[in-house]
Amino acid sequence: MATRRQPLIPGWLIPGVSAATLVVAVALAAFLALWWNAPQGDWSAVWQDSYLWHVVRFSFWQAFLSALLSVVPAIFLARALYRRRFPGRLALLRLCVMTLILPVLVAVFGILSVYGRQGWLASLCQSLGLEWTFSPYGLQGILLAHVFFNLPMASRLLLQALENIPGEQRQLAAQLGMRGWHFFRFVEWPWLRRQIPPVAALIFMLCFASFATVLSLGGGPQATTIELAIYQALSYDYDPARAAMLALIQMVCCLGLVLLSQRLSKAIAPGTTLLQGWRDPDDRLHSRICDTVLIVLALLLLLPPLLAVIVDGVNRQLPEVLAQPVLWQALWTSLRIALAAGVLCVVLTMMLLWSSRELRARQKMLAGQALEMSGMLILAMPGIVLATGFFLLLNNTIGLPQSADGIVIFTNALMAIPYALKVLENPMRDITARYSMLCQSLGIEGWSRLKVVELRALKRPLAQALAFACVLSIGDFGVVALFGNDDFRTLPFYLYQQIGSYRSQDGAVTALILLLLCFLLFTVIEKLPGRNVKTD
């Protein structure tokens, strides 16, 4: 009797293996392109290059300071946000999340409008007869921008750790008379210290790979990071060998940081509590004053740059800028790239999670983790490094394309996969635990299960992942910086051209449009499932 031939790869494994192979192949192709173009021969001259080591040291130094200045204040701000309830608190917490996806050049424009030599604070000091000496360029400007982006995110993540503390622990501490330092040390710190290392590692990695911020606010050779040196080597000096060498160094550093971040990241289980929302009745005056001051300072950090973008964008150049076809061409380019990259990102992420879910269900935990880790691998290759690999690969083979839509879409989709994984990973596991036995008993599998179960139950997480991926793509500048030209420009690239040509009023209008587009796109996509969507 003939036996049925077994497939070489099970059908449920094909999606994840295909997506993982694609991601790894792209990373490997970019790496080989960099390696082949790196200078051959004696590497001793590389290690003796004083400017190279200055760039590497500055990259680490600014990332360390940025992480320190973001995490330490975030500890106290998170405690203040946990203890206080005030009008607009939910809006502030949402703003803390939105800073993560805010286009870098929009924030930079707002920071320059507030802290620049012709900015709001300079005008205020001049009216008071004082001299404004702060310059938003150089190391201090880079740190200011990084704190603007990362302090809110760190506060939000640490607030989650505080919310996981069981109410019984807080009540017992109050009954024992624990206040101030002792309460922080014995109750809050054990929960915070598990979250602080992974948060600090994440911020360090993001700041180490920062490109648009340093490009806009670096202010000269003394404030140059590895990514900016790569851009200069390709765009100004056209030295592919040096760019490849710098990209390899950047990739090795980022790979080490990714592995460190993964090692430090530990899931914190929520505390079991019957006293949800319990608050200490002994709410002292000085505690309320300190918390209020911290929250007001956080608002003064976040709101002025955003308000500056809105206020400066509504100027007399507004009708003229809106009438320019170039603006709408850039907007359409940004929109189509963002939507295509977002959809591709979510599809690849679901492919990885689908096969990973099946591997875990078959008790193959290590294989499932390896499949998910392939999606995180792209963090070791920042956008500018990946784009450099594509640039060298195409330049040495078929030549650079006239329109780089496909390259930018593909690169942005890959760069957003880690964020989409974080959004979809836990909901996917929850659905597996809830419906797996039922699907097996009913014989629902494959495409039928995806259509009947996953796509219905994951409507909200899928919309959120798509929104994050689209907005991250629409605000990206690192990849477009290498491939952008007068025939292919996105809104961030167009804004950078306006800033570089000192058309500040035109740039203000573009920054406002980009800001509104990001918030509108994020809100519309996130609301697509509807308020009363049923996930059962």
Describe the role of every protein-language-model region.
Residues 113, 212-238, 476-504:
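Glycine-rich helix-loop "coupling/hinge" segments at transmembrane-helix boundaries
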